[in-house]
Amino acid sequence: KLVSVVDGAGMTQDVIYEGRPDSRTKHSFFWQTKYALDSGVVDVSYRFATDDWEIDSHTIDSRFRFNLGDNNYIQPHLRYYQQSAAEFYRPFLNQNDPMPMYASADYRVGEMTAYTVGLKYGHKMENGHEWAVRAEYYQQDPKNAGFDEPGVLADLDLYPSVKAVILQFNYHF
């Protein structure tokens, strides 16, 4: 992966390879609650994660399996994710600043939020096998973590959203 080195007008003067620390220590806290109802199961979870790259993240995930009789169900799914930027994240480097020991322009270690919205339909067959189809929409929105965008960079979308549609078919036997 590469990092652009720009001048005061925002024009690229050089391109360097990114550098990341050789190791990463992560810690996390996870909590999950499942609650059985007559009509189905509610599943809610929360995860906090932190690491020595200074990335802190929060994830809230929820699913509600709603039974449609004995053999069918639908399951809505909502997930929200938020993370801070790694201490070495830089969308670009300024040629007038000292070069840092580590730098990465990879948006995946930058500040961002993301969400998933989806629905799953499942059917249990008479032989005990089960099939299901799931459709979800995912959107990831990178954020500016406080960087001044010089010159022409101010007119560009340096943090475009990433969007995906997921369609999955499962068969369990």
What do these predicted ranges mean?
Residues 27, 38-42, 58, 70-74, ...:
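Outer-envelope beta-barrel architecture signal
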Residues 25-27, 35-39, 48-52, 80-84, ...:
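Transmembrane beta-strands of outer-membrane beta-barrel pores
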Residues 44-46, 64, 76-78, 119, ...:
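Membrane-embedded beta-strand positions of outer-membrane beta-barrel proteins
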Residues 73-124, 149-151, 156-158:
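Outer-membrane beta-barrel translocator/channel fold
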Residues 121, 160-173:
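Outer-membrane beta-barrel "beta-signal"
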Residues 1-6, 46, 55-60, 87-93, ...:
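Outer-membrane beta-barrel translocator domains and adjoining extracellular loop/strand segments
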Residues 1-54:
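Acidic, serine/threonine- and glycine-rich low-complexity intrinsically disordered segments
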Residues 23-29, 56-58, 111-115, 161-165:
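Residues that define the transmembrane beta-barrel architecture of outer-membrane proteins
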